[in-house]
């Protein structure tokens, strides 16, 4: 999905809005566990969760120890609730599907506490997109990449 312009407001039953967040969250201890099948599955889980919440992923990157996402969210979802759901569901599912992660994270916490969030009003979409575009060499036409 291309970036929304200021004229491309989203609509709800009683609202018209354009709310965009740039999120970053990291693995506990910054371990490089988001590789291969784990990274691909994480991307799919995040996409599913966002779809359930009607959140549009404008751009994203799964790196080895962190995730960046620029999203457009409906007004009923606060940044803290978005992160609670994305981090919680993804950790639960990844631990179920990849038992080797349980050995690395014996305390059952895949993600470090906290996250970074900024509205795209503070950082322009172009600044975030440029950072994500140059974060690594892009290999696909997909808007949500997995770092090699």
Where do the protein language model's features map onto the residues?
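Basic nucleic-acid-binding interfaces
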Residues: 1-148
């Amino acid at each position: 999905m291309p970036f929304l312009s200021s004229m491309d407001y989203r609509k709800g039953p009683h609202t018209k809005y354009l709310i965009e967040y740039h999120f970053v969250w990291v693995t506990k201890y910054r371990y490089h566990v988001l590789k291969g099948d784990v990274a691909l599955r994480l991307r799919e889980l995040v996409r599913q969760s966002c779809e359930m919440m009607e959140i549009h992923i404008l751009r994203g990157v799964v790196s080895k120890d962190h995730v960046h996402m620029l999203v457009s969210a409906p007004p009923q979802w606060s940044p803290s609730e978005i992160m609670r759901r994305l981090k919680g569901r993804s950790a639960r599912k990844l631990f179920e599907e990849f038992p080797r992660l349980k050995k690395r994270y014996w305390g059952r916490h895949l993600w470090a506490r906290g996250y970074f969030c900024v509205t795209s009003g503070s950082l322009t979409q172009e600044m975030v997109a440029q950072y994500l575009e140059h974060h690594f060499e892009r290999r696909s036409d997909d808007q949500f990449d997995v770092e090699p």
